[in-house]
Amino acid sequence: MTQKRRNNGRNKHGRGHVKFVRCINCSRAVPKDKAIKRWTIRNMVETAAIRDLSEASVYSEYTIPKLYIKLQYCVSCAIHSRVVRVRSREGRRIRTPPPRVRYNRDGKKVNPTAVAKNL
């Protein structure tokens, strides 16, 4: 039988069984090593209330704590919500993560390779 991926779409190497997690979108049971995982980091307080909190705070340099949320998707929901994209047969072999889009202070896109050359 032909093999679509080198890791069979999983990260289970050498383990017999892996516990299941639930997809946050459809609640499907997905093996933990197969689930597509993403972290979102948000402020605990919405942006409109940050200024009010800083004015009312006794501490001058109080940093508002952040929420670290782990999102776990099944493969079909991750593709549907464009968390991951379908790649060609040659593209699937590329194991390096895609280049991240960076923005400068003006809000313009910055090419990461050009920035690395300047340093």
From Swiss-Prot:
Span list, region Disordered: 88-119
Highest taxon of the lineage: Eukaryota
Cellular-component GO terms for this entry: cytosol; cytosolic small ribosomal subunit
UniProt GO BP: cytoplasmic translation; ribosome biogenesis
Listed Pfam families: Ribosomal_S26e
Keywords: Cytoplasm, Ribonucleoprotein, Ribosomal protein
GO molecular function: mRNA binding; structural constituent of ribosome
Described function: Component of the ribosome, a large ribonucleoprotein complex responsible for the synthesis of proteins in the cell. The small ribosomal subunit (SSU) binds messenger RNAs (mRNAs) and translates the encoded message by selecting cognate aminoacyl-transfer RNA (tRNA) molecules. The large subunit (LSU) contains the ribosomal catalytic site termed the peptidyl transferase center (PTC), which catalyzes the formation of peptide bonds, thereby polymerizing the amino acids delivered by tRNAs into a polypeptide chain.
Subunit structure as annotated in this protein's UniProt entry: Component of the small ribosomal subunit (SSU). Mature yeast ribosomes consist of a small (40S) and a large (60S) subunit. The 40S small subunit contains 1 molecule of ribosomal RNA (18S rRNA) and at least 33 different proteins. The large 60S subunit contains 3 rRNA molecules (25S, 5.8S and 5S rRNA) and at least 46 different proteins. eS26 interacts with eS1 forming part of the mRNA exit tunnel. eS26 interacts with TSR2.
Name of the featured protein: Small ribosomal subunit protein eS26B
Gene responsible for this protein: rps2602
